[in-house]
Amino acid sequence: METLSFPRYNVAEIVIHIRNKILTGADGKNLTKNDLYPNPKPEVLHMIYMRALQIVYGIRLEHFYMMPVNSEVMYPHLMEGFLPFSNLVTHLDSFLPICRVNDFETADILCPKAKRTSRFLSGIINFIHFREACRETYMEFLWQYKSSADKMQQLNAAHQEALMKLERLDSVPVEEQEEFKQLSDGIQELQQSLNQDFHQKTIVLQEGNSQKKSNISEKTKRLNELKLSVVSLKEIQESLKTKIVDSPEKLKNYKEKMKDTVQKLKNARQEVVEKYEIYGDSVDCLPSCQLEVQLYQKKIQDLSDNREKLASILKESLNLEDQIESDESELKKLKTEENSFKRLMIVKKEKLATAQFKINKKHEDVKQYKRTVIEDCNKVQEKRGAVYERVTTINQEIQKIKLGIQQLKDAAEREKLKSQEIFLNLKTALEKYHDGIEKAAEDSYAKIDEKTAELKRKMFKMST
């Protein structure tokens, strides 16, 4: 018994705990150490045990003086003085094992001993402390469960309200459905028309650009050819410049010189003719003079041909330059037209982008609101999950407490059955005792009758 799971209190501590936890009022004030030690008073212990049973089981005082309903006694009036003791023993026999006291006996109430009584009271006080702590914990869990249930109801209501708001946001009102449909149809038609117009203009611009690019490529090719021809002509011109004069003055001077030369040649020719006429007979000199004249004539003819060729080349180069300038102006016009088309296309794209941006912004606002509502719902769901986990833990603890209560009830039922068995044994013993008393009374009555009859006979004999 020394290794039990409750502390052993001394008499002073037991008196203090009994005054604070078990006995109240005048009974607690009148309790002293002499009532418990060294010779415990049975009536004080009966009062303490009854009060402890009232605290733990809720048994009222009058129940100790009542016959149990589930028992049948032939002479209940004979047990009126014995009922409080019997009920107290029965309840203590089931209550003290819960307090880790397993050696309780009936003699501990009839003839209590100080050490055993202090141990029994220590176990009862420890159990009452444990019961109060468990009750506080249970009440705290119960309060948390109620508050969690209220919060869960509030969160469910908020969740339902958020779902209703989300449905209202997702659904278009009846009075705005027609307008919303018209707006959506108008936006779709506008987008389709813009897409078609943009596609057509893009195709036209692409065709015009491709055609103009082909023309530009042809003209560029022609221009490159002309540039090559100009370069070749310039090379020819450079080569001819060595042969001809560069400036008009020089050309004039050269022409004058040539004229002078021609005149000189004419004069020389005249002289030659004169000489020919003079020297007609000079046959040997005539061929050489003719060859020289032919050479000079050939040179003059080459010079005139080169001059005409140079003039034609210059004219052709001027024509090519004019054509290049006209092609460049046409190319500039095409570029300006292309830029205007690009600007128009950019304006159309900007209008389409603004319309699309407004639509996307509206959709984004709706999506953002949906996301906020969904985040709120997720937060509510997370809180609900946390509350649900707390409720499940509380329910598990409640189940554990209920299991402990059920175990206590089972133990109480077993003790009840045990006490009923004891009561039946006492009942049978009492009935046997009553039968013996009746038989003894009958025997004594018979003996008394015999003795009275014998005395009467003796008195009759003495009188006669």
UniProtKB/Swiss-Prot annotation:
PTM note: Can be phosphorylated by AURKA and AURKB.
PTM-bearing positions, type N-acetylmethionine: M1
Chain segments carrying region Interaction with the N-terminus of NDC80: 1-385
Cell location: Nucleus; Chromosome, Centromere, Kinetochore
Residues where Phosphoserine is found: S171, S247
Coiled-coil positions: 147-345, 389-459
InterPro entries (UniProt xref): Kinetochore_Nuf2_N, Nuf2_N_sf
Record's GO cellular component terms: cytosol; kinetochore; membrane; Ndc80 complex; nucleoplasm; outer kinetochore
Region Interaction with the C-terminus of NDC80 and the SPBC24-SPBC25 subcomplex, annotated ranges: 386-464
Keyword tags: Acetylation, Cell cycle, Cell division, Centromere, Chromosome, Coiled coil, Kinetochore, Mitosis, Nucleus, Phosphoprotein
Function: Acts as a component of the essential kinetochore-associated NDC80 complex, which is required for chromosome segregation and spindle checkpoint activity. Required for kinetochore integrity and the organization of stable microtubule binding sites in the outer plate of the kinetochore. The NDC80 complex synergistically enhances the affinity of the SKA1 complex for microtubules and may allow the NDC80 complex to track depolymerizing microtubules.
Family to which this protein belongs: Belongs to the NUF2 family.
Name of the featured protein: Kinetochore protein Nuf2
Origin organism lineage: Eukaryota, Metazoa, Chordata, Craniata, Vertebrata
